A protein has these predicted regions:
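N-terminal leader segment of winged-helix/HTH proteins
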Residues: 1-41
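N-terminal helix-turn-helix DNA-binding core of bacterial DNA-binding proteins
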Residues: 26-70, 96-103
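Base-recognition residues in the alpha-helical recognition helix of bacterial helix-turn-helix
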Residues: 51, 76-77
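Alpha-helical residues within the helix-turn-helix
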Residues: 65, 76, 82-83
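Residues in the helix-turn-helix
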Residues: 73
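Beta-hairpin "wing" of winged helix-turn-helix
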Residues: 82-92, 99
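Conserved segment of winged-helix/HTH DNA-binding domains
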Residues: 99-119
Length: 119
């Protein structure tokens, strides 16, 4: 049985392009961190939470009712989003309110929907 190799054995054809693009590439660690960020958007509940928080700051109980899941499930997802600096929180008496960490998060969600709905 032949083993197929997918490694390109050709020489550089457009060295100027390769060098130009190479100078604009980020570090491998940056790509790993970006991939980790995008993984957070791979869960529908987390994306729904982010979209809801784009509309208004909300507490765990209200998010749970809105999305039809348990408070525990919402808290679990919010922890992941908080650790990635996608959401922030503030306390008011016994209630914790969550909101998007900054406008960049809103832009990511908005661009995602824009891409989804393009014709």
């Amino acid at each position: 049985m032949l083993k197929t190799s997918y490694i390109c054995n050709c020489d550089v054809i457009h060295e100027d392009i390769v060098n130009d693009v190479k100078s604009k590439m980020q570090s491998k660690d940056d790509y790993i961190q970006l991939a980790s960020l995008f993984k957070l958007f791979g869960d529908g509940t987390r994306v729904q939470i982010l979209h809801a928080l784009e509309q208004s700051e909300m507490c765990v109980c209200d998010l749970a009712v809105l999305l039809g899941v348990t408070k525990s499930a919402i808290s679990h997802q919010l922890k992941a989003l908080r650790l990635a600096n996608l959401v922030k929180f503030r306390k008011e008496a016994q209630i914790v309110y969550y909101s998007l960490a900054d406008d960049h998060v809103k832009e990511i969600i908005d661009k995602g929907f824009e891409h989804l709905w393009q014709k």
